[in-house]
Every structure is written in structure tokens, then in C-alpha cells.
């Protein structure tokens, strides 16, 4: 284990007010120390490293120039917020990042007054910033609002909706576009720095405001002609006419790692801007840490690693991951059916669709951070006879719910939805938990909703979805590795709406939806040891339900427990609705539904989260004993 870095200048900075006492010439050294501190911290916790390394100078410059927290600073997504946390009173806890009871990996309002708006999903910062800017105007305060958004997040339509609205309102909003895709090289040299200072200066911006007032008296046609002439002329020097057309004053691109560029521009904008301003800053993801700079993903998300070598800790898996099983099964099916296509929203590696892209590049589409578009794009393909697999994380599918309802479900289009990261996801906390997909999909008429109990079942569900053309179909599976079951050479086509009994008993029935099946089987061992004969069943389907299986379990057992890693309103609620409507609760059946608790569960390891929720072996056994008014047997495994 390496020792924490020496940081004499950073040791003087606890809050931004301390930072503002430093001279400009001290800031490059401070940036080096912040990088060293962040690298050491993330090497111990894992997390999102590359994005934060790329915005160290920008973060320091913003806090140096603006009066945070009175001035509002909003980070989009939040992957880049680690330097911000170090500089805003949280350095003493930075080595608890993404750990149980530790700092969040994202900005959170409840964590600090320096986090005025929480983030984790993309493209929200400009909308939130605009709301805050308008609030400041209504209150007649001189509060500035700064939204920092990456070029990736700018691929989502919500960002442009907000830009368009901000321009129309002529709001006092500062948007900083952090361009770390390296598609545009940052300008270098004294002339580019001079032009950026000139464009952001009082004279130029004041002349622009004067021009706006003058042309207001000359009629709309002359106004438009003059405005276009000025902005197009300026565009030859600085670019950015698209943002100008939306009503933003555009500055840049400027070097996001040069304080000589950043500080004068930010100060000019602070002192002179009256309407919306967009500052285009070019940065390098992974800046200042050679292993990150050399890596293809710039160390976007990393495990714990060795600071000297950059080598990440790797735990040898006991079984293949669910994501890899899905990807291999989809490639296998795609090789046999040229109508199968894959769609991902900027997550080809995370969803495994990079494997499909390697095998069939013309049949795999990365649409960017645009889940709404992804779903309707898939609907269009389905309408033309293709078999689209729109692979999305559960938490991101939420962003496209209207498209799922209006464009897919109502039209009965056979779009396939592989739903990754279902259930608890651990260190990313409540913003990324896959909690609600079963509940919001199972309410839709004609929608088939499946959950894989293990990796072999997942393979069956991939083939089942490929073969199903009667309407939309989904299948959910968690993050992480499978349970190590024997794998079929190819998946089987499952009968729609039919579950399976895995273990037969007579007194207690445990009905699992998804990967909680393994804990149900373990719990059954403890229940059997306590003299309670236990049936364990795998529902497979939340919609359509297996009515025959439900009737059998309800009529021949004293107690029925449904278990799912999802919210209330999901599988258990569907079961309860059916049993009550059929009168199967009238004869004294004891029934319990185990779901995620109705709270936003904080980050922890998934197994700890399941234990807290009562969804593990011990929680299931405890639920049975409480319902049957029996004490917990000595020796029951936890």
C-alpha cells in the first residue's frame, strides 16, 4: 500500500474560501496536488477516475473565480465531481467514496451545500441550472449559476431543450461544455488566449448588448440580419454558431488545462455576462496520470489499483457474468437470424453489445445518450420486420417510459428489451439501482416480462425473446457473475407464461422472480431443518403469470412467499392481485411479498443491500418464522 501523497498547498485548502486566498501562480501546484490526492483515494476505493482527472484545473478555476456555494455550481452526471468534493470540505472522507456509509460517487444535495443539485443520470444540468437562474432573477439576486456538462451528455435531447429554453428566456446562465472527446484539438498559443479574453471582455460583450438594444428599434427583419451578420463573422474566429442561434453567447474552444486561459475568461464572464453564455473548454480525460492517459477508456471506471503501475485488482470470477452470457447468446442467435439487430444508448461495453458490434457491425447501433430515441428507433425497426434488442440498464430504461408505452406497447411492436443491472447495483447507490422495471412494464397490456434466475435461464430467455414476435418482451438480469450452473450449448425457447417448480414440498412455498432463487433454495434447507417442508418455484414470468402454478401453490401450501429484487408494485403485487381476484386468499393462505424496501437505499455491497432488505437466505427464513409465529431456529444460516 502506498503512503498518501504530500500535499502542502492542498493542506491549506478546506473550502473554496481558502482557495480564493491563493495567488494565481499557486494554482498549477494545487492542481498537481489535487490530482495526486484523487489518484491515491480512488486507488483504494475504485470509482470513476478519468473524468475527474480531466477537470482538475477547471474545477479549481471555477471555485477560485465564483462565490460558491452562493453561486451555484452544477456538474452533469457527476463522474467528474471528485476534485470538487476534495475542495469543498470533504477531503477527510474522500477515501470512503462509494463505500457503505461513505461519500457518494456523485453530487448529492444532502451531502453538502456545495452540491446544489444531485446528479448521476446525464444531461440534466442545464435544465436544473436554468431553473436556478430564473429563481435568482425572480428574487432579484446577483447569484450566478454555472452548469458543467460533458460532450457525451450533450448527445441527449434534454440538453438541447434546455439550451433552447435558456436562450429564449435570455437567462443569466453560464454553461461550460467540457469537451474531452479529443475530437477538437484545444487552441494553443498567445493569440488564441488573447482572442478568448477579447471575446469574453467587457468591451465586446457590452457592444453586443448595445447592439441588441439598438436593433430592437429597427424591426425584426433588420434585427435578424444584423444579428446573423455579427454572429457569423464572429463564428469565423471562435466557432459556435449553433449555440449562438439558440441565443447563447459562445466563447472558445479554450484550453481547459491552462489557468492562463481559464481564469481571465471566467472572470470576464462573471463580471460582464448578462444573458446565457456557453464556454467551450477542451480537456483530456485521464490528464496527469500516465496509465489513464494510455488506456483506451482513460480509466473511466476502475477497480482498486496500484498507483505506481496502474494495474487494477481483478478477482477471478467463479462463473461468467450475466452481461457476457447475454452477449454471447445474442451473437449466437444473430448468427442464425439476420433480422436480429442490437441497440445501445452509449453503453456498448456495459451491455455487452460490443460483442455483437464486433461480429455484425452493420447490425449494431450505438445511438448515444438517447434512451428515448433508442426505444422508438427500435420500434421503427420492429415495424419493418426486424428483431431489435434494445439493451438498456434498468435505471436508464426509466428515461424512455413514454416511448415504451406509446411507441412500442400500444402498437404491439415486438421490441426486445434486455434489462441489465436489475436489482441492487452496489457502489453507485440509489440513482443506479434497477428497482422499478418490473413494476412499470408489468402494468402494460400485452407486454411479456421475464426475469432470469441464473445464467442458463438467461440464455433461454435470449432465445425466447428472439423467437417471440407477438409483441414486446423484456428480460431482466443483475450486474455481476452468475451462480455457476451448467450451461446449455444453446438456449431453449420457453413457453410464454410458464414457470417451473425447482423443489417440491408441502407446507411453505417460496416463489422467486429472478436471481433470488438461489437464496430461496438455501432458505429451504434451513426451513426443512426446522421441520417445514418447502416448495421452491421459479416464476420466470411476471407477465403473463403462470396461473396454473399459482393455483397449485396457493391450494396445497399453508404459506406462500414471493421474493423479488424489485420495488413494490412488481411481481408480488401482480401475484396478489390474481390470487385475490380468484378467491384464493379466502381460505386462510398466509402470503407475504418480499421486495425492495420503500426507501432510497444507500450504497453498499449488493449482498449487504439484499440482507438489509430481507431478501437473502436469513431474511426469507425470518419472514416464514414470523408469519407462522415460530422462533428462529438455532443454527439457521445467515
From Swiss-Prot:
GO terms for biological process: 1-deoxy-D-xylulose 5-phosphate biosynthetic process; glyceraldehyde-3-phosphate metabolic process; terpenoid biosynthetic process; thiamine biosynthetic process. It comes from Rhizobium etli (strain ATCC 51251 / DSM 11541 / JCM 21823 / NBRC 15573 / CFN 42). Pathway: Metabolic intermediate biosynthesis; 1-deoxy-D-xylulose 5-phosphate biosynthesis; 1-deoxy-D-xylulose 5-phosphate from D-glyceraldehyde 3-phosphate and pyruvate: step 1/1. One of its GO terms (molecular function) is thiamine pyrophosphate binding. Keywords: Isoprene biosynthesis, Magnesium, Metal-binding, Thiamine biosynthesis, Thiamine pyrophosphate, Transferase. This is 1-deoxy-D-xylulose-5-phosphate synthase. Mg(2+) binds at residues 151, 180. Belongs to the transketolase family. DXPS subfamily.
Amino acid at each position: 500500500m502506498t503512503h498518501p501523497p504530500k500535499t502542502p498547498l492542498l493542506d491549506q485548502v478546506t473550502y473554496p474560501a481558502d482557495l480564493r486566498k491563493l495567488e494565481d501562480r499557486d494554482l498549477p501546484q494545487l492542481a498537481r496536488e489535487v490530482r495526486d490526492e484523487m489518484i491515491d483515494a480512488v486507488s483504494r476505493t475504485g470509482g470513476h477516475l478519468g473524468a475527474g482527472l480531466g477537470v482538475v484545473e477547471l474545477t479549481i478555476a471555477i471555485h477560485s473565480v465564483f462565490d460558491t456555494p452562493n453561486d451555484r455550481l452544477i456538474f452533469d452526471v457527476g463522474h467528474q465531481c471528485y476534485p470538487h468534493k476534495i475542495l469543498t470540505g470533504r477531503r477527510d472522507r474522500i477515501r470512503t467514496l462509494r463505500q457503505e456509509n461513505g461519500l457518494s460517487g456523485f453530487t448529492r444535495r444532502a451531502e453538502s451545500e456545495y452540491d446544489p443539485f444531485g446528479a448521476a443520470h446525464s444531461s440534466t444540468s442545464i435544465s436544473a441550472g436554468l431553473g436556478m437562474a430564473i429563481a435568482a432573477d425572480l428574487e432579484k439576486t446577483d447569484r450566478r449559476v454555472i452548469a458543467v456538462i460533458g460532450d457525451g451528455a450533450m448527445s441527449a435531447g434534454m440538453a438541447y431543450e434546455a439550451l433552447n429554453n435558456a436562450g429564449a428566456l435570455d437567462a443569466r446562465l453560464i454553461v461550460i461544455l467540457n469537451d474531452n472527446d479529443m475530437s477538437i484539438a484545444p487552441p494553443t498559443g498567445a493569440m488564441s488566449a488573447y482572442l478568448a479574453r477579447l471575446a469574453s471582455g467587457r468591451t465586446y460583450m457590452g457592444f453586443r448588448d448595445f447592439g441588441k438594444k439598438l436593433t430592437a428599434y429597427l424591426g425584426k427583419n433588420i434585427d435578424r440580419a444584423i444579428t446573423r451578420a455579427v454572429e457569423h463573422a464572429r463564428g469565423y474566429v471562435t466557432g459556435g454558431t449553433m449555440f449562438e442561434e439558440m441565443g447563447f453567447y459562445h466563447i472558445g474552444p479554450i484550453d481547459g488545462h491552462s489557468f492562463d486561459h481559464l481564469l481571465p475568461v471566467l472572470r470576464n464572464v462573471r463580471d460582464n455576462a448578462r444573458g446565457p453564455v456557453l464556454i467551450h473548454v477542451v480537456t483530456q480525460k485521464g490528464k496527469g496520470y500516465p496509465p489513464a492517459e494510455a488506456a483506451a477508456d482513460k480509466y473511466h471506471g476502475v477497480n482498486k489499483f496500484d498507483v505506481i503501475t496502474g494495474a487494477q485488482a481483478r478477482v477471478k470470477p467463479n462463473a461468467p457474468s450475466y452481461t457476457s452470457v447475454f452477449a454471447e447468446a445474442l451473437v449466437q442467435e444473430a448468427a442464425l437470424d439476420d433480422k436480429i439487430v442490437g441497440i445501445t444508448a452509449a453503453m456498448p461495453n456495459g451491455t455487452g453489445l460490443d460483442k455483437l458490434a464486433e461480429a455484425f457491425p452493420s447490425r449494431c447501433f450505438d445511438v448515444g445518450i438517447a434512451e428515448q430515441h433508442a426505444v422508438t428507433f427500435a420500434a421503427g425497426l420492429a415495424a419493418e420486420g426486424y428483431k431489435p434488442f434494445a439493451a438498456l440498464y434498468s435505471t436508464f430504461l426509466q428515461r424512455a417510459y413514454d416511448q415504451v408505452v406509446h411507441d412500442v406497447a400500444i402498437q404491439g411492436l415486438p421490441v426486445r428489451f434486455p434489462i441489465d443491472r436489475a436489482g441492487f447495483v452496489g457502489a453507485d447507490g440509489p440513482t443506479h439501482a434497477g428497482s422499478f422495471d418490473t413494476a412499470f412494464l408489468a402494468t402494460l397490456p400485452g407486454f411479456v416480462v421475464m426475469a432470469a434466475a441464473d445464467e442458463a435461464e438467461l440464455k433461454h430467455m435470449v432465445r425466447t425473446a428472439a423467437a417471440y414476435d407477438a409483441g414486446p418482451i423484456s428480460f431482466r438480469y443483475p450486474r455481476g457473475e452468475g451462480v455457476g450452473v451448467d450451461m446449455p450449448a444453446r438456449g431453449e425457447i420457453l413457453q410464454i407464461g410458464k414457470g417451473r417448480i425447482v423443489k417440491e414440498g408441502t407446507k411453505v412455498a417460496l416463489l422467486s422472480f429472478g436471481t433470488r432463487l438461489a437464496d430461496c433454495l438455501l432458505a429451504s434447507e434451513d426451513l426443512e431443518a426446522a421441520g417445514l417442508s418447502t416448495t421452491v418455484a421459479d416464476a420466470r414470468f411476471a407477465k403473463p403469470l403462470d396461473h396454473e402454478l399459482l393455483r397449485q401453490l396457493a391450494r396445497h401450501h399453508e404459506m406462500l412467499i414471493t421474493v423479488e429484487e424489485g420495488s413494490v408494485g412488481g411481481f408480488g403485487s401482480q401475484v396478489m392481485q390474481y390470487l385475490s381476484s380468484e378467491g384464493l386468499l379466502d381460505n386462510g393462505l398466509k402470503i407475504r411479498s418480499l421486495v425492495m424496501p420503500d426507501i432510497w437505499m444507500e450504497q453498499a455491497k449488493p449482498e449487504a443491500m439484499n440482507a438489509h432488505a430481507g431478501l437473502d437466505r436469513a431474511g426469507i427464513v425470518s419472514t416464514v418464522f414470523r408469519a407462522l409465529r415460530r422462533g428462529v431456529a438455532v443454527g439457521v444460516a445467515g
